[in-house]
Regions:
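Hydrophobic/aromatic beta-strand patches that form the interior of the parallel beta-sheet core
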Residues: 9, 144, 170, 211-213, ...
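Short, conserved loop/helix-junction motifs that constitute active-site signature segments
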Residues: 160-166
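Active-site metal-binding loops of divalent metal-dependent hydrolases
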Residues: 13-14, 65-68, 148, 174-175, ...
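Metallo-beta-lactamase
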Residues: 1-135, 139-151, 166-227, 244-251, 275-291
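Active-site glycine- and acidic-residue-rich loops that bind
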Residues: 149-153, 224-237
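Cap/insert and terminal regions of metallo-dependent hydrolase folds
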Residues: 83, 93, 101, 109, ...
Length: 319
């Protein structure tokens, strides 16, 4: 995707197939065709894992950092992990116990345990994707973490050492306070579902590289960060601007285009759903009917699109 003088390069890290999210709306045939690259015929949903690379001025900026090296873990289902193959019921029982202990609704418990049965996860591609883009990890000057969930910060370290040794790691203060403090949340869910270590443990080797921000700011010429909380306390988006053109990388403020089209539909993963809905509403109002191209680290192929409006309804068009 070219925005004025800047090129945004998609950096793939993996793909995650899960059961369809609860509340997925019925789509007419025309709309279903538009969203068919991630809402699959068998009723499952496909989500990409990845990041975006932008060269600007003297900086090489990576927006998000994927789930991480595959050696750190794997998904359940068809992952091939011996423990998951031998004892899937044990993993499901742990997930059920974890969610019930947190007071989760039974429908949420059922969905997550079903996801463990049918999900398919492949990851660990980011290093090769950077190579294909002609960039070495030590050439990255800035890594912007849209938030500190493990599928967005996963490559910050590998085997206890920094993967981007010369980069500033941009994280919002509110997320650092939430995920990296002594009172950090229990990340059992992610470990069971994705097979990865906690955010806190993976950020520990790069503590001295973290660049905290608490007000909307500029990372590099043409790249600005905006706080849009709800999914996590410090959830944010990145805005790339050049020659009066704009694109937005939405992190997990939006997981899939259907969340933009249908204001009543939301992927069930926001820490503060009410605040997340407000952020989504603000975003829709800003981009609807404009030439602003948007993507997220989970859109199919990390492709961009626009939110349009016609005949009294919103619809999605791929760029």
């Amino acid at each position: 995707m070219r925005i004025g003088d800047l090129e945004i390069i998609q950096i793939l890290d993996g793909e995650w197939t899960t059961p369809a999210a609860p509340g997925l709306p019925d789509l007419d045939p025309e709309a279903a065709a538009v969203h068919s690259n991630y809402i699959l015929p068998d009723g499952k949903m496909s989500a990409q894992l990845g990041a975006f690379l932008v060269r600007t001025g003297n900086q090489v900026v990576l927006l998000d950092a994927g789930l991480g090296p595959s050696a750190q873990g794997c998904g359940h289902g068809d992952c091939g992990h011996p423990e998951h193959q031998m004892k899937p019921q044990m993993v499901e029982a742990e997930v059920e116990e974890f969610f019930r202990s947190k007071g989760a609704p039974e429908a949420q418990v059922e969905w997550f345990t079903n996801m463990l049965r049918v999900q398919k996860l492949e990851h660990g591609w980011l290093e090769d994707s950077l190579t294909k883009a002609g960039v070495r990890p030590d050439e990255i000057t800035d890594v912007v973490l849209s938030h500190l969930h493990p599928d967005h910060m996963g490559w910050v370290s590998r085997d206890g050492a920094s993967f981007f040794p010369n980069a500033k790691l941009w994280a919002h203060q509110a997320d650092a306070d939430f995920f990296l403090s002594d009172t950090a949340p229990d990340e059992t869910t992610f470990k069971l579902m994705l097979g990865v270590d906690s955010t806190k443990s993976r950020m520990k080797p790069v503590h001295n590289q973290i660049e905290l921000w608490d007000r909307d700011c500029t990372v590099a010429p043409g790249i600005d960060l905006r706080h849009m909380p709800g999914h996590t306390p410090g959830s944010s988006i990145a805005i790339v601007s050049s020659r009066e053109e704009r694109a937005m990388m939405l992190g997990d403020v939006i997981h899939c285009p259907l969340e933009l089209v249908d204001s009543e539909f939301a992927i069930m993963s926001d820490i503060d759903p009410a605040m997340a809905k407000r952020s989504k509403d603000i975003l829709r109002q800003e981009i609807e009917g404009t030439n602003i191209h948007v993507s997220s680290s989970h859109f199919p192929g990390l492709e961009f699109g626009r939110l349009l409006k016609g005949e009294g309804k919103r619809y999605w068009a791929w760029s």
